[in-house]
């Protein structure tokens, strides 16, 4: 199936694993193909993890962050987006943290109230409270006044730091230009020729209106069964049907002579 451009990397990866796919086409609301993402693209997304602004560049929704972390937004609007700022782990003393945390940043903290207050005082955009820590009413009220989103998660900070980048929507990583697609009425011989000239393993297939309907892979073409035919009366290539070389000849029945046809397997020849 096609995926929506706002689907998170985590959900896209789960969908690809469910269907054992290496390529996931991305469609818009009316089913028109918009782009695609591969498992290689998802793997490369982790290579940018050293950039602590990559999350904001991907602009995930707070709801998507919460779903990725199997957590809950307890303060703030879950439908808003994290669009600017860096990602921090609040593991230092507050006097050190306040020198680094800036406005609109996202910070992961534990159960220490002074750390939580430091994050709110810095006007961070989001605070993720780890290990299922209960957030006090006073902290929630202060965060509400400062427009700081609070997300609580059962995971530890290390796990959150690993998973949070999976909340980025796949539109941030998808390929949009130079896509190789096929129409459902294209001939397999033509498709094979194109496939041999590219490194991709799977290709989107669309109908005449450009709507995505499925994918075709190299493996699919390897499993194509040739048409089986029996030649009667004439067995010269020039007298046979077009593209006879692409068919599997089972038997030849002819009362003339043996022609010049070649096959990859033994055939039954009856001269009568």
Across the structure, where does each feature detected by a protein language model lie?
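Non-catalytic interface/targeting segments
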Residues: 32-106, 177-186, 196-198
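Feature captures the catalytic cores and cofactor-binding loops of soluble hydro-lyases/lyases
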Residues: 88-173
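A glycine-centered beta-loop-beta connector
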Residues: 16, 24-42, 195, 203-219
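Beta-strand/loop-dominated core regions that host nucleotide or nucleotide-derived cofactor-binding catalytic loops
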Residues: 3, 9, 13, 17-20, ...
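Structural motif
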Residues: 23-25, 34, 86-87, 94, ...
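The conserved cystathionine-beta-synthase
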Residues: 2-20, 27, 46, 117-121, ...
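A short, polar/charged loop-to-alpha-helix boundary motif
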Residues: 39-56, 160-161, 219-231
